[in-house]
Amino acid sequence: MSPMMRALQHANYTFAKKISHTADSQDQRHRMIPGSRPLLTLADTREPDYITPALLQENPRGKEVYERAMQDAWYAKNQLLARGVPQEIALYLLPNAKSIRLVESGSLLHLLHKWTMRTCFNAQEEIYQSSLDEIAQLREVHPQLTKHIGPPCHLRAGVTTPICTEGSHFCGVKVWLDFPNVQRRI
């Protein structure tokens, strides 16, 4: 690591997040950005507490089916608890859409790597949006840094080719022309 890059280890940021269990599991791939996650047994709710994917938000029939499935999952879990099944067993019924609230902290060096990977249009939608939210919070305290943050194509444009590092998985959108103001369509 170059001496200039080492300085990025000294700037640290902390974010409070609410994401689905699925997104949290994927987000944990960035091991250098640790998070404090609650035990599911301590964060259990009687009422459904889940994340709805953007794709379903835009589809009334799909959203209706999805919400019914969430209601059914929590109802079944609550029925098991009422019948004396241990909580750690009953929680197996909860879907991966269950909301997880956590606090995550990391150095600017490691967050830059995460944001580069997770602001690409090929990133999972929920993690993409979470990364944009984190960058927006960073912009409030250190606006001068955010021009150096974005997907690989944003960082490589005008510097090297190919601009997109995804090869045959190129999303087809020239994100680098107007990041972060570009619209992501699902």
Language-model segments: what does each one mean?
Residues M1-I186:
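A conserved ligand/cofactor-binding region detector
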